[in-house]
Amino acid sequence: MLRPNKIHQRTVREIIENSICRIFRWPYLWAANIFMALGLFNLRRNVEYCLSAMPDNLEYIPDTFVSVLVISEDHRSLIHFGVDPVAIARAIVSTIFLCKQGGSTIEQQFVRITLADHEQTFNRKLREQLTATLLSRRANRCAIAKAYLEKAYYGTNFNGLHALERSYGKNLCDMSLDEIVEITARLKYPQPLRESTILRAKFQRRCGWIKMRLGRLPVVADGVVRQLGTAA
């Protein structure tokens, strides 16, 4: 149970983060629309391609998968606009201090794997951010998260959720919360062909961290998905 001062600190932090996302929302939208109107970065084509890559039927993926994904990979998903300026700032600071840390949202990760664009350049990153911004305005955020989960790489011979269903020998709707946590943790630490003791320990720590986050935010099970369904 969180102490009152911890709750207050979290509330203040959330207010600040919400304000930062609101401040950056419109500049990103303006830039994305201007770039698209000028035909730069092939934004229109990229957005349409990403939309067409989203399957029509994603109901077979339980909402719990999305909830765990949001908590572990993109906990500000309810307040950002497809790009998380807070995470970007944190990633820049971490890079300066030689501690690499990701700042990509679920929308950005979906754009990246859909377009198969992994160039380590500023232009690629900007193109990805602008595409994610426009995509989040066109598509249901929960559907984007499920489409990402369906296409994501989870390790050797584990491309997409259907491969995981075969591996676990059960449907997604029959999987336990512990199994969903393990699957989500594989997004950061994909299953290698041969797993070393060090990699196994990192994977287990990741699972423990996700479970801790779920324990601290018990309302995630339904609330996150319900709100994501209407976010734009």
Task: Please report, for each region that a protein language model flagged, where it lies by residue.
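Juxtamembrane regions of bacterial inner-membrane/periplasmic proteins
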Residues: 1-232
